[in-house]
Amino acid sequence: MHSLEKVTFEDVAIDFTQEEWDMMDTSKRKLYRDVMLENISHLVSLGYQISKSYIILQLEQGKELWWEGRVFLQDQNPDRESALKKKHMISMHPIIRKDTSTSMTMENSLILEDPFEYNDSGEDCTHSSTITQCLLTHSGKKPCVSKQCGKSLRNLLSPKPRKQIHTKGKSYQCNLCEKAYTNCFYLRRHKMTHTGERPYACHLCGKAFTQCSHLRRHEKTHTGERPYKCHQCGKAFIQSFNLRRHERTHLGQKCYECDKSGKAFSQSSGFRGNKIIHIGEKPPACLLCGKAFSLSSDLR
């Protein structure tokens, strides 16, 4: 494929006002970065040249690439000085890396769960690289529109969480079991249950955990630290949660009541175990010995 003309990131970028950007939550900002990231990658795959400009150098160094109240442009030259006068706009540029052939490749990819339809051609845009082709084919920046809600890509990324409405707020899905999460952090943590990965290891006994908080809790068993003490009986606990649960035994509180049997429990774990009995759900079992437990915490 012969090399096509040079294009800039701004040719396919979506700009937001300062007010719009401030109203976007973390997941919307990440979605915006991922879409822009795939746009750059697809431009390269189509043969378009991405100039080795100042912003690319900044990207490779992993530096912060946006400031409030101005546009951070990819090419700073006299022809574009007027653009620097724009106020109250933000361009968020994704982090990309350089491979051995000096072409720009994407660090992460994103397949949008919504199918998009381009206004001019009616072509389906199932992911952002197809959106990029549409943007380059037609004149001007026409929006791609979601078939499910009729909102454009720009509106999808704006403060109202249209994409999360389609996916019931869970936009991060496991490709092994299809379980979905609202946050990529929770998805990564869940995937460890498939891989068996336990990155947090105790330096004293070598026991490993999937979460840093579990490691810190375990380390207190070595030090004997029990910072949470009941003011009524003096019993101390490693976790504040265990203290609160213990205090209910003094108060006689039973906050969890089964709507089928009417049985009440002071702890949520007992309530969940009772619920398993009613719905006939198979309790979690040990993969090594086959022994079943009413609670997953007992299995661990």
Swiss-Prot record:
Zinc finger region(s), C2H2-type: 172-194, 200-222, 228-250, 256-278
GO molecular function: DNA-binding transcription factor activity, RNA polymerase II-specific; RNA polymerase II transcription regulatory region sequence-specific DNA binding; zinc ion binding
Swiss-Prot/TrEMBL GO biological process terms: regulation of transcription by RNA polymerase II
Domain KRAB: 7-78
UniProt cross-references to PROSITE patterns, sorted A to Z: KRAB, ZINC_FINGER_C2H2_1, ZINC_FINGER_C2H2_2
Cellular compartments annotated: Nucleus
GO cellular component, one term: nucleus
Gene3D superfamilies registered for this protein in UniProt: 6.10.140.140, Classic Zinc Finger
Domain of life where this protein originates: Eukaryota
SUPFAM superfamilies cross-referenced by the UniProt entry: beta-beta-alpha zinc fingers, KRAB domain (Kruppel-associated box)
Main location: nucleus
Keywords: DNA-binding, Metal-binding, Nucleus, Repeat, Transcription, Transcription regulation, Zinc, Zinc-finger
InterPro entries linked to this entry: KRAB (IPR001909), KRAB_dom_sf (IPR036051), Znf_C2H2_sf (IPR036236), Znf_C2H2_type (IPR013087)
Purpose: May be involved in transcriptional regulation.
Family according to the record: Belongs to the krueppel C2H2-type zinc-finger protein family.
Name of the protein this chain belongs to: Zinc finger protein 705B
Native source organism of the sequence: Homo sapiens (Human)
